[in-house]
Amino acid sequence: MSKILKSTTLGNVKNGGIFKALGKEFVKLDADEHGCLVLAKDIWTKMPFRDGDDPECPNDLRRSDVMKYLGNCLAEFTEKGTPLDTFIPFKIDLQDTTGQTEYGIVEYRIGLLTLRQYGKYWRLIPKVDTPWWLATPYGTPNCSPLAHGSG
């Protein structure tokens, strides 16, 4: 077991429960035989989805600054001694809000919720005072959805 989770067994944390790991607070959203889906309890940073224009794929999560940031967070966690296998790879379906599938399905160890996941878990997600990004691209080429923290 990872030293960062030695005091918390996620199987004992109920869905919607808050736990501390990696020096941060998280909420457990769900679990299955592979592991747990968790979400940061608070906003870690404020940033644009992408800094600058990408006319070919303006709302593509794979090319976003948000995912670069989260990749750096993962690197920091592992550099500080957290085993990489603590972060179980999971698939994110990048189907847009109109049903188009040109962005495909990607796999990450740390990522964003999709619009469907937000709809499924919104009752468990703590309220925050600022909007936050979702992985699901809009059907238009200009935007990605935001979740407004007030509900």
Per-range role (PLM):
Residues 2-151:
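Collagenous Gly-X-Y triple-helix signature in extracellular proteins
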